[in-house]
Amino acid sequence: MKVLALRHSVAQVYADTQVYTHDDTKDSYENAFLISNLTTHNILYFNYSVKTLEILNKSGIAAIEIQSLEELFTLIRCNFTYDYENNVVYLHDYSYYTNNEIRTDQHWITKTNIEEYLLPGWKLTYVGYNGNDTRGHYNFSFTCQNAATDDDIIIEYIYSEALDFQNFMLKKIKERMTTSLPIARLSNRVFRDKLFPLLVKKHKRVINVGPRNESMFTFLNFPSIRQFSNGPYLVKNTIKLKQERWLGKRVSQFDIGQYKNMMNVITTIYHYYNLYQEKPIIYMVGSAPSYWIYDVRQYSEFLFETWDPLDTPYSSIHHKELFFEKDIGKLKDNSILYIDIRTDRGNVDWKEWRKIVELQTINNLDLAYKYLATGKSKVCCVKLTAMDLELPVSAKLLHHPTTEIRSEFYLLLDIWDVNNVKRFIPKGVLYSFINNVITDNVFIQSPFKIRTSMSDYIVALYALSNDFNNRADIINLINNQKQSLITVRINNTFKDEPKVGFKNIYDWTFLPTDFDTTNAIVTSYDGCLGMFGLSISLASKPTGNNHLFILNGTDKYYKLDQFANHTGISRRSHQIRFSESATSYSGYIFRDLSNNNFNLIGTNVENSVSGHVYNALIYYRYNYSFDLKRWIYLHSIEKVDIEGGKYYEHAPIELIYACRSAKEFALLQDDLTVLRYANEIENYINKVYSITYADDPNYFIGIKFDNIPYTYDVKVPHLTFGVLYISDNMIPDVVKIMKSMKQELFGMDVTTSYTYMLSDGIYVANVSGVLATYFKMYNLFYKNQITFGQSRMFIPHITLSFRNNKTVRIETTKLRIKSIYLRKIRGDTMFDMSE
């Protein structure tokens, strides 16, 4: 949802939009809660409170002050990520298609011949990093840029088997127009750019697990972050390959040679980071014009020094000349060298050309060895061709996509490789590597061993759920790692599937109850964003590939109403209640009936079951930004940090009742996942609360009334306001609590309206208006370790007779309380108080 705050109303009506006017009788938190549970996507918030907007944004719900109709129109028609700390809106808006335009934030693409293969009459526009160059399009009171681009389509094409780019792009655009917006992909880059600067500033050592190419620019600024990926393809791994011949396959219609060079250099940079944790000087020989240097320097500043007879316009220092062996002495330590020397073939006969290429390969390799032979802190990436070669067994083979698969590949070497054992690799084996292996990631660091690291902050976004990881190891890491941000795939199946398919692999699935943490926040993507100064206009879908975000060691853990809070907890319930249910009271009625409470008079105000817990369980797929386990735990240890809002503390038994209702709901819906989740939450409640039951009571609290509007034959008709199991020396403690609640007890609005048979031979009158006070008293007894209440639900009633009688219905009648007393069962009254 998105909340657009205005000082005055607008005449125009928008689809999927509700209006909310600030309620001055409620505080900012209560207004935020009410707004978050509205059911439309767009909320126009009039006479707004800035504090309410802050609360919504911290909850991950985008809420923005609007100063003009143009701002309103722009934000109401598309989704976006909002940096509420810096007042920057990142639109995810593809309406630029109506200009016959596709967009990119990679400059090198604009220097290719890609426009020859676009849809007829279409053009390519460069918009800068995250759409930074579009800021001039929006003259708004907040900074605004459109981060939507088509780079995902272009990059997917490069790695696909498709050759016809126009048809590929047409299909992908049509898919984009008919499926839901991939909001997480668009928003994730904004999130990463906010997340990692904060982590590096706060923590000495940061580990990042499973980065992919989407993050390759983000981490250029962070050489100290240790990356873990799937590992490199080593020379020694070629032993598994069978010999093949030259294939000669076209990969892309437009020239992507620059993409290949960029990926090679960035791979080399990250290998250098892994070894030395600092930025290198970047030396490049050949590969002009290297327009991609502009892209790298848009994200992070490097010193590029290049040699090539052709211009290299974005190099820091360019030598418009050839590079020779004698020039190696000019290269400094703490550097990387990229060797991409290859003479143009021209009209040379292919046999003669092959001899030239093989000689250049030997020379290139010799340059690499000489560069690495002296000095320190060096890494080299060198172009080679498929031929009989002796190569270090530990060297890394690279084959990033290029325009055509021919005979070239690249070798990544460091100082240790040069001194390692060399192995003879036949030409046919290298052709087999070239023909069958594509390097699909610039991060080639070793795989992460799933174990705790107490001195590190571990980040693992979308990286650990794969079923080739041991599920128990993942759980153990999350349970024991002191500081981390880890995601795992949420179990949003209906059959409680332990793993689900994703692309060509399987992911383990998880529920919050799979983890045993006491200092971690478990939330959704949008809930996590709120903790890092961001919010989003589109929440995660209830089905599909969604993840739990688990933050260990966060300083926001105790701020229960500010982060991963209960905003939106009833939104799904409201959607169903007013569109599909038999009555808008369906939820209340079901919760009471499923706990054998058949008095439904005033069911929407006389709550005996926690609606929060019930909704958090049965609709967890929609509202898992709310960290239910944390909410339960902090209440159980009485460390709830509440800043504001209408606060009601549930008695633990109310939470148990909610679990029982949720289990019955799950059985009726055949929802095995909710059934397990509700069972495990009930077990968790019993674990963190020391709940005892007076199922064999020896005392009770009774309430006598001045007026009983029914015929009765018992000696003293009374309301049993709870039973106790106590020792005699605890009586003073019970009396003290009763006295402390005297005003509230006598202030109850107690009513009755009918009689019924509670069971065979027990004729009773119903009682309404006492449950809220009962549960408050329950809490006081619980905190004083006094056993109060039974395991079955408390059903308030007045016993009238021990004979069977017909039901009588009367007008709702107020009962006047005469006295409240503590009495021993089959014994004496120990305490009695009147108003």
Curated annotation (Swiss-Prot):
GO terms for cellular component: viral nucleocapsid. Keywords: GTP-binding, Host-virus interaction, Hydrolase, Inhibition of host innate immune response by virus, Methyltransferase, mRNA capping, mRNA processing, Multifunctional enzyme, Nucleotide-binding, Nucleotidyltransferase, RNA-binding, S-adenosyl-L-methionine, Transferase, Viral immunoevasion, Virion. Residues 171-245, 429-555 are annotated as: N7-methyltransferase activity. GO terms for molecular function: GTP binding; hydrolase activity; mRNA 5'-cap (guanine-N7-)-methyltransferase activity; mRNA guanylyltransferase activity; RNA binding. The keyword Disulfide bond does not apply. Residues 556-692 are annotated as: GTase/RTPase activity. Multifunctional enzyme involved in mRNA capping. Catalyzes the formation of the 5' cap structure on the viral plus-strand transcripts. Specifically binds to GTP and displays guanylyltransferase and methyltransferase activities. Has affinity for ssRNA but not for dsRNA. Capping activity is non-specific and caps RNAs that initiate with either a G or an A residue. Together with VP1 polymerase, forms a VP1-VP3 complex positioned near the channels situated at each of the five-fold vertices of the core. Counteracts the host innate immune response thanks to its phosphodiesterase that degrades the 5'-triphosphorylated, 2'-5' linked adenylate oligomers produced by the host cell IFN-inducible 2',5'-oligoadenylate synthetase (OAS). The host RNaseL is therefore not activated. This is Protein VP3. It comes from Rotavirus A (isolate RVA/Human/Belgium/B4106/2000/G3P11[14]) (RV-A).
